[in-house]
Amino acid sequence: MTKLVRQSVTLPASARELYAMYLSPRTHKAITGGKVVISARPGSKFSAFNGMLRGRMLHTVPGRLIVQAWRSAGWKKGDLDSTLILRFTPKGKKGRIDLVHANIPDHDYRGVNNGWKKYYWRPWRKYLSRH
């Protein structure tokens, strides 16, 4: 069985800025602390946290949407890739990210669900408070 993660976060930057930060290897690394290879080009490979997360870009809408095929290095060989959808929308002077992460293997659901909060949303909020 697989599971679905849904999360929303509002951060003190515009939706366009948040989109650009996620797709900038330099800023993404500054936020998360791990090496990142990423591009907005559909079909391009990406990796984060020094290769612990990897996949490919499926689709982007500049400033608004990122869709990735995504998997963790800790997943079993037979586990299918998951699909990550990040939607960026304005919320006043802030930006909102709505995340849908589908096809998460049962054995890593808790890790993925908590990982978004621990390794992305909290560090991103901290990064933005300093910049």
Indicate where each model-derived feature is located.
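A conserved amphipathic terminal alpha-helix motif
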Residues: N103-H131
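Hydrophobic residues positioned within well-ordered beta-strands of beta-sheet architectures
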Residues: V5-Q7, L84-L86, I97
